[in-house]
Amino acid sequence: MNTFSWIFLLALGVSLALKLWLARRQLQNVAANRGRVPDAFADSIQLEAHQKAADYTITNTLQGRLELVYNSLLLVGWTLGGGLQWLDSSWQQFGWGTIPTGVAMLVSAFLIMALLELPFSLYHTFVIEERFGFNKTTPATFIGDMAKQALLMLILGVPLAWAALWLMQESGHLWWLYLWLLWAGFSLLMLWAYPAVIAPLFNKFTLLDDENLQHRIQSLLDRCGFKSRGIYVMDGSRRSGHGNAYFTGMGQNKRIVFFDTLLKTLEADEIEAVLAHELGHFKRKHVQKRIVTMMLMSLAGLALLGWLIEQNWFYQGLGVQQPSNHLALLLFLMVSPVFTIFLQPLFSWFSRRHEFEADDYAATQASAADLIRALVKMYKENASTLTPDPLYSAFYDSHPPAPVRVAHLSTKTG
């Protein structure tokens, strides 16, 4: 161990302590408010539904707290515990050469990480979601999803890893810039291809066939100047009772998707209001802003890695004795979240700001009152807590807390 080892452990300890403290605040706040529905929701949400949401939030937070400790121990095991060094040495014995060995190392490491997360995924799906009446996933579907995800990782990940390691080896001291261009291109390609190629591997998508709703939606799209490949309904009920809607794709491949569970919950005017909110993200260019932000972050990260890769203390401080490009990449991907935790509340704040902007747009194109009714139904059906801890919410939540969001929309109903 060297000085950087202690810096890493200190940062990890501070990060873990902060997250555990926030989780404790969330648990205490939700439990303290479990016995009473907030006044703003007293007429629309019954105490039983409110208590279910509180219990669901508490259960998920408890599991999340356990995962925090588990993942921190795994990270120490992978790094200072010698896990990565051992796995790399195992692949080196085959004598395949630098790039093939690096690709095998990257792919196997990510597969092992996924397997180590499997117990939590199984427990969440088949115990927690089942207990609260949300789970519709069968063991066969769960296994099928895992197999598809693994196959996709191999089909997409192996060529990407090979190209990345080749650039790191062959393109000189500016390899990080070329790798960033590769990553940017790949990310944009995936964003474009996801709706039409990847998502249908996991869910069935059908065009909305309700003529009355189609007419209302098309009228809204025309008012907003939005052209898409269609309004789709996804068979979300095949896996879960949760409902949602989202905007996906880019260019000529833009789509708006409703979960079938959501369409069963909301009335036509409420669906129109939810769609107006999603269109607000499009009109306010939130997707483009997020893409640019992520691209700049990845550029800064790769530039930093371009310097770290030459520093022996970086490897030795994280339990690696034989430096290599693929180990530098793995170490950076695994450890950087520990040192960038301060960005989490900043990104959450920007995301909540975008949600407010989308709500404001929806209030001008549809009805704020309809959107409020839709949100209340979604909070109820998804068992979303109405009383999150303010600091926990500020740190993590991508959407404004329910009372704050509804209060904001209420100012737009006049």
Map each language-model feature to its residues.
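Polar-ligand-bearing catalytic/cofactor-coordination segments
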Residues: 2-322, 338-414
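Alpha-helical transmembrane segments
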Residues: 331-335
